């Protein structure tokens, strides 16, 4: 039988190459990957942060595809990971007598962040086409002196062409564990399922096709007053948009939700929040990445 699904994997190991960028430590990496993953050229900012775009060469996922993405940050590393295009999930493959409703495409993400390291994982949006079935799982292990920023933006269907998600389903599970010398603590757990029912429900998405999450887990000893100032600045961003946004304060960090009709508006909101997080963390101001949609760059 000819295999029609992808089984791809990508392993990235980042580490500090001390004082290789003038007087600034530079983060470099080693990698191992198979199709459909492809790594584009990495760059560095003035703080030595490694900026790496990842490309999915197959153009999208269909039922039965299975991907594994593993990221390790060694001590004293700074990394910005992103993707060069939106992730598209199609519903045309995977339907059979055994699975009449289709088969899920799946992605497993394993992330480990060691001492004094900081990972920003900001992929472009995931688009669930009609009848697309997609499940993603994240397991993140982070030290007490490190931070993790993650954005997850989902569009259900192509509303511009009148297409809905129909029988499609999006599932996501995020687990973040904090490591210390004695035991591991649960830092954050989030589980989401989006479907036609939740899309139409008044208590759900209420026919808004774009749903986004921004999660920032900071260092264990991060200043509470700085987090309060951050929340105040983010609320000012909320006042400048007509979209539905909410913010929650975690034990160590924040959680932001977006609900609206425009992916571009969601990206803009998250970029503005990212700038605030960089500022309160004492890092340089982020720049719009060249692999992101060109039309957005005019608004930032």
Swiss-Prot record:
InterPro entries (UniProt xref): UreD
Subcellular location: Cytoplasm
Keywords attached to this entry: Chaperone, Cytoplasm, Nickel insertion
Molecular function terms, GO-annotated: nickel cation binding
HAMAP family noted in UniProt: UreD
Protein purpose: Required for maturation of urease via the functional incorporation of the urease nickel metallocenter.
Subunit structure, interactors included: UreD, UreF and UreG form a complex that acts as a GTP-hydrolysis-dependent molecular chaperone, activating the urease apoprotein by helping to assemble the nickel containing metallocenter of UreC. The UreE protein probably delivers the nickel.
Protein name listed in UniProt: Urease accessory protein UreD
Organism expressing this protein natively: Prochlorococcus marinus (strain MIT 9301)
């Amino acid at each position: 039988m000819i295999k029609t699904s992808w089984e791809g994997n990508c392993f990235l190991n980042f580490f500090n190459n001390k004082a290789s960028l003038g007087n600034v430590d530079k983060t470099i990496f080693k990698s191992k990957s198979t199709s459909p993953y492809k790594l584009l050229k990495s760059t560095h900012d003035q703080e030595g942060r490694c900026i790496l775009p990842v490309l999915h060469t197959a153009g999208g996922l269909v039922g039965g595809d299975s991907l594994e993405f593993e990221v390790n940050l060694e001590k004293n590393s700074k990394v910005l990971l992103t993707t060069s295009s939106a992730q598209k999930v199609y519903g045309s493959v995977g339907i059979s007598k055994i699975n009449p409703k289709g088969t899920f495409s799946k992605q497993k993400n394993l992330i480990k962040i060691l001492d004094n390291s900081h990972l920003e994982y900001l992929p472009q949006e995931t688009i669930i086409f009609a009848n697309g079935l997609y499940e993603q799982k994240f397991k993140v292990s982070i030290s007490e002196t490190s931070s993790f920023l993650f954005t997850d933006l989902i569009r259900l269907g192509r509303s511009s062409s009148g297409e809905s998600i129909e029988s499609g389903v999006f599932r996501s599970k995020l687990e973040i564990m904090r490591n210390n010398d004695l035991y591991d603590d649960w830092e954050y757990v989030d589980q989401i399922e989006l479907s036609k029912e939740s899309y139409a429900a008044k208590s759900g998405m209420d026919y808004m096709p774009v749903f986004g999450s921004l999660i920032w887990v900071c260092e264990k000893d991060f200043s509470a007053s700085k987090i309060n100032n951050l929340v105040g600045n983010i609320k000012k961003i909320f006042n400048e948009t007509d979209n539905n946004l909410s913010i929650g304060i975690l034990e160590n960090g924040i959680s932001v939700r977006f609900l609206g009709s425009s992916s571009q508006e969601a990206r803009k909101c998250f970029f503005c929040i990212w700038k605030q997080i960089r500022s309160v963390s004492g890092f340089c101001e982020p720049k719009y990445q060249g692999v992101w949609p060109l039309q957005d760059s005019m608004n930032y």
